[in-house]
Amino acid sequence: MEKVKLGMVVAEFNRDITYMMEILGKEHAEFLGAEVSEVIRVPGTFDIPIAVKKMLEKGRVDAVVAIGCVIEGETEHDEIVAQHAARKIMDLSLEYGKPVTLGISGPGMGRIAATERVDYAKRAVEAAVKLVKRLKEYDAEGS
């Protein structure tokens, strides 16, 4: 089986944390024998879906990993951002028939908790690679 090609969409808001997530995700992809072949950085988590859609439209990746960090503020804004981004990301996965995995930490956490959850990126990369392989195996069985 050829190398799994991943796209990665990374939110720049809370960049100190999403930078660590991006690096961990890329390292884990390499460890799994996959390749992060495309990266788009967007201003914030709410902006992730449009970049995911562009990446899926190009068709050069097998899956997309969404990386973001939503930290709790004074209002419920963090919950709205995380819920809407997650929902649209799932919709895009179904629309294009390719895995789009969620490496977005939050909502309802502070900066310390966010730093402790940078491994969400590794989990999202692993889920993307496994899902690509399993869907290809399933397609091959049905032939």
Swiss-Prot record:
Biological processes per GO annotation: riboflavin biosynthetic process
Q: Which UniProt keywords apply?
A: Riboflavin biosynthesis, Transferase
What does the entry list as the binding residues for (2S)-2-hydroxy-3-oxobutyl phosphate? E74, T75, R117
| EC numbers | 2.5.1.78
Residues holding 5-amino-6-(D-ribitylamino)uracil: F13, T45, F46, D47, C69, V70, I71, L102
Keyword Transferase part of the UniProt annotation: yes
Pathway(s) per entry: Cofactor biosynthesis; riboflavin biosynthesis; riboflavin from 2-hydroxy-3-oxobutyl phosphate and 5-amino-6-(D-ribitylamino)uracil: step 1/2
What is the catalytic activity of this protein? Answer: (2S)-2-hydroxy-3-oxobutyl phosphate + 5-amino-6-(D-ribitylamino)uracil = 6,7-dimethyl-8-(1-D-ribityl)lumazine + phosphate + 2 H2O + H(+)
Q: Which NCBIfam families match?
A: lumazine-synth
* Function noted in UniProt: Catalyzes the formation of 6,7-dimethyl-8-ribityllumazine by condensation of 5-amino-6-(D-ribitylamino)uracil with 3,4-dihydroxy-2-butanone 4-phosphate. This is the penultimate step in the biosynthesis of riboflavin.
What does the similarity note say? Belongs to the DMRL synthase family.
According to UniProt, the name of this protein is 6,7-dimethyl-8-ribityllumazine synthase
